[in-house]
Amino acid sequence: MTDELDPALIERARKLFAGDWQFIWASPSVETLPPMQGLEVAFAGRSNVGKSSLINALTGRNGLARTSHTPGRTQELIFFEGPADAGFRLVDMPGYGYAAAPKTKIASWTKLIHQFLQGRATLVRVYVLIDARHGIKDVDNEVLTTLDKSAVSYQIVLTKADQVKPAELAERVAATTEALRKHPAAFPEIVVTSSRNASGMPELRAAIIKLVAERS
């Protein structure tokens, strides 16, 4: 992905994400969502896949999104806003697939995620985070299918790539690419990242601002 992105774009993205990003809103239900303003880019994934860590790595602000070793801690849609010229917000979605949570809570999270995906006109893309150590699970496929049915554009981001051997990682990327052929709303390119060593972050930042520029 690096080869396809202009170095000037990567630098512009770095500067934008190094700006003043702040938490602005937490929504436990669609009734409490903030007014639609500008564009929104959301991050979805299984519990403990590294969504909050990725948002912190993107913005270079370790405390922006709260991280936790307890699966299922993020139970709301969390909105972050950047510099005035950014033109978009970041949305940290509740983690899914946490089997130990009460069934009523799982149902509530599922409803919130589905309603948000299907009714948010300002949402331009969902980045679905997949743990590079494990690949796409059944629960991930369920979410991808929901995105397909909702006609919401999404892209796969592999996380924790630093914890996978290079040969195994290449196989994981190939298998994920093949799996995406079944999903019409999926963007074909996969972003490989590590929040620990920041690999893939420049490319992901650049991809986001390129997308926002195209949709603005």
Swiss-Prot record:
Mg(2+) binds at residues 52, 74. Keywords: Cell cycle, Cell division, GTP-binding, Magnesium, Metal-binding, Nucleotide-binding, Septation. Necessary for normal cell division and for the maintenance of normal septation. CDD domains: YihA_EngB. Gene3D superfamilies: P-loop containing nucleotide triphosphate hydrolases. Residues 37-214 form the EngB-type G domain. The gene is engB. GO terms for molecular function: GTP binding; metal ion binding. The keyword Disulfide bond does not apply. Belongs to the TRAFAC class TrmE-Era-EngA-EngB-Septin-like GTPase superfamily. EngB GTPase family. It comes from the Bacteria. This is Probable GTP-binding protein EngB. SUPFAM superfamilies: P-loop containing nucleoside triphosphate hydrolases. InterPro entries: G_ENGB_dom (IPR030393), GTP-bd (IPR006073), GTP-bd_ribosome_bio_YsxC (IPR019987), P-loop_NTPase (IPR027417). GO terms for cellular component: cytosol. GTP binds at residues 45-52, 72-76, 92-95, 159-162, 193-195. GO terms for biological process: division septum assembly. It comes from Rhodopseudomonas palustris (strain BisA53). Its cofactor is Mg(2+).
